[in-house]
Amino acid sequence: MTAEEIARYNESLLCVPGEAARLRDLTRLRGRDVRWGVSVRRTSLRAKPTDALCPTRAGDRYDDALQLTAVLPNEPMALLGESADGRFCRVETSYFAGWVPAEDIGLCRDLEAWRTAQEGGFLRVTGNRVTLCCDPYEPRVSGAALPMGTSLPLAASPGTVRALRGRMSYDNYLVRLPVRRADGWLEYREAMVPVSADVCVGDLPYTHENVTAQAAKMRGEVYGWGGMLGGRDCSALVGDVYRCFGFR
């Protein structure tokens, strides 16, 4: 499939009746009494507003019935409410609904504001995980962990060399990373991603060889039910792999 065919496939999913299509189409919530936000790091989406473990077998620390899935950084979501203590927001993402820690969300004006921030080229994380270098001037991006499938807007064309917080961007991509301000609102801060990192500009070509290579990058890591333990379960593995080709 070409990039154009993948885009048409993504659009066609909105036409399939059922809950999955309803979730994918966040635009249906425009104009309603909802707030909007963006994940500022990989975070958990929970069935209830608590981070307490709820294993189906007593003492099993690899299981949690309340863990639904993981949300990658820079994912938009509709905010439908919050817990009594304000620690969790009830959200809808493009593929799941549940509760997300409020500290992992940056508030934005609306879905269009997020889309505007994504305009232009983007960098796709194609490695299992990419960890950014330490930044003593901007702790919100320092050492940021970016899982496979994460998409970040480019802040400049590849090859651009300029100063950023005391460093020159030689051999780095310049990207915009979502962060949460002190007042809870979303802000994008520039950061550097080394050209040696396992990333690509745009999406990978959708070939059998590339799909196999992407899946192989996760061999041997811990199975994480719903994204627990920093790992992936079966659906997250498939989802993160296919995001690298532009599938939603």
Role assignments for model-derived ranges:
Residues L66, V161-A163, W225-G227:
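Generic recognition of flexible, low-complexity loop/linker segments
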Residues L68-A70:
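Signature of short aromatic-glycine-proline-rich micro-motifs recurring in repeat-based ectodomains
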Residues H208-R248:
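Catalytic cores of peptidoglycan-degrading enzymes
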